[in-house]
């Protein structure tokens, strides 16, 4: 048997686990030529050539594949399938059989499962290769034809791309919106109330006042009042559910917000973690997790943080894309003590950046199977001289999954009324309907509307 993958690191890891000869192509070994367009403009048929530094590779692959059952194990995505297609064309005439093997985790269990599910390459989904062709041919046509035109027109060397040019247009349009934006003032009217030593803010139910005079008139109206009367007291327990394991997009967002990693760096580090058998495949829209691994997480949680943090049944997270359910979300391949994260990365001779990303993935996966956080949420409505004011508060009652994976900037929803998170999280005193509380002061907060934000 012979296994062929893209990455030399992954090849070494697989061979060490299975004891099966494993070769790598080091990515694509065929592409469109650099010196010409490489696409028939009548039929859109591409002409692929060997990379200059990989001219020897096809012969090496044929020699190794002769008489062998060949597992074509490029990554389980469009690019990986395309590489497998190109390998197949080279070795099909000499190999005993060619099978497509999709690897989602580089572990003994994961590799053996992938081998048992391998299918004859002729029976695989050629649509993935057509998707690759559409992308690659589109890249070449747009770039090769339009870049010279743009360079001549703009009198400088410019590159036009299928993706980069529309992306630049979106960025430019947003920047124009920002530069052309004219801020307008608005005001928020609040009162400071006090009971039993607890001071808190209540805001006028109207929210924004676009005319300062209107807000000032209300200030004058309530200024002489010394108390506010509680008209409504509503208390309830609210729950914040644990978030699912990472998808690719969620991982990039969290790594940018928490670790200050660019999306490119995040994917490079994740590729290294995957190739070394530390995480499952990192290009995924799925949030599903293997049931056996969920059981491992639950055992780990029971031993490390206690049964109170375990829901009665495992959390079932649903992917937005039903087709993604065949795969898993991004998770570690092995459960272990949290303190061992750095040690495991060190054994693979990876970097501190790999450690930080791995810890993020590890903690998110663990937290996804924890009990929800519970809050005591309170809504109070007050009357002051016939005007209504609202105070909301939330007190953490049980931290649940937050014990392991605290809420980050990428998780927080912005306040719709512009009052900020302070009001939401303030502590409110116990009150009954009809009770009066002391009004310490009233004030206007001057605010400005904000332009749309830049893309992140």
Model region roles, listed by residue range:
Residues 106-193, 235-239:
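C-terminal or mid-to-C-terminal helical accessory/interaction module adjacent to the motor/catalytic core
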Residues 6-9, 13, 52-56, 78-82, ...:
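Charged, alpha-helix-enriched surfaces in structured cytosolic catalytic cores
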Residues 261-324, 330:
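Extended, well-ordered alpha-helical scaffold/bundle regions in very large, multi-domain proteins
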Residues 91-95, 119, 145, 149, ...:
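A generic secondary-structure signal for well-formed alpha-helical elements
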């Amino acid at each position: 048997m012979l296994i062929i993958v893209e990455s030399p690191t992954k090849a070494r890891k697989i061979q060490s686990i299975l004891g099966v000869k494993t070769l790598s192509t080091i990515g694509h070994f065929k592409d469109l030529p650099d010196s010409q367009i490489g696409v028939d403009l009548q039929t859109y048929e591409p002409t692929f050539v060997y990379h200059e530094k990989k001219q020897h590779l096809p012969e090496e692959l044929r020699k190794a594949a002769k008489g062998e059952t060949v597992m074509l194990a490029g990554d389980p995505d469009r690019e990986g399938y395309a590489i497998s297609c190109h390998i197949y064309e080279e070795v099909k005439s000499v190999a005993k059989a060619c099978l497509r093997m999709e690897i989602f985790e580089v572990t003994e269990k994961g590799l053996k499962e992938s081998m048992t599910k391998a299918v004859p390459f002729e029976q695989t989904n050629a649509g993935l290769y057509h998707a690759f062709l559409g992308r690659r041919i589109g890249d070449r046509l747009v770039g090769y034809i339009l870049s010279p035109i743009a360079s001549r027109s703009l009198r400088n060397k410019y590159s036009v791309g299928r993706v980069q040019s529309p992306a630049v247009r979106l960025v430019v349009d947003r920047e124009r919106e920002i530069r052309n934006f004219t801020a307008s003032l608005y005001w928020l009217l609040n009162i400071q109330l006090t009971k039993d030593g607890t001071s808190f803010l209540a805001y006028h139910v109207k929210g924004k006042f676009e005319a300062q005079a209107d807000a000032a008139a209300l200030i004058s109206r309530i200024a002489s009042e010394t108390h506010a009367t509680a008209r409504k007291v509503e208390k309830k327990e609210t729950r914040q559910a644990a978030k699912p394991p990472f998808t690719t997009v969620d991982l990039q967002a969290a790594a940018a917000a928490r670790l200050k990693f660019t999306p490119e760096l995040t994917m490079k580090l994740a590729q290294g973690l995957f190739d070394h058998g530390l995480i499952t495949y990192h290009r995924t829209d799925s949030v599903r997790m293997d049931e056996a691994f969920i059981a491992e997480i639950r055992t780990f949680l029971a031993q490390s943080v206690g049964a109170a943090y375990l829901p009665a049944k495992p959390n079932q997270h649903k992917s937005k894309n039903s087709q993604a359910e065949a795969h898993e979300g991004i998770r570690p391949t092995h459960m272990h003590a949290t303190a061992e994260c750095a040690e495991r990365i060190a054994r693979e001779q990876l970097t501190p950046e790999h450690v930080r990303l791995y810890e993020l993935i590890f903690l998110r996966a663990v937290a996804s199977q924890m009990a929800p956080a519970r809050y005591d949420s309170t809504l109070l409505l007050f009357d002051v001289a016939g005007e209504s004011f609202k105070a909301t508060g939330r007190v953490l009652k049980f931290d649940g999954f937050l014990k392991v994976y605290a809420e980050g900037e990428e998780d927080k929803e912005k306040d719709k009324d512009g009052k900020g998170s302070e009001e939401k999280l303030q502590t409110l005193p116990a009150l009954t309907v009809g009770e009066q509380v002391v009004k310490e002061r009233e004030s206007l907060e001057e605010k400005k509307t904000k332009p749309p934000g830049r893309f992140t």
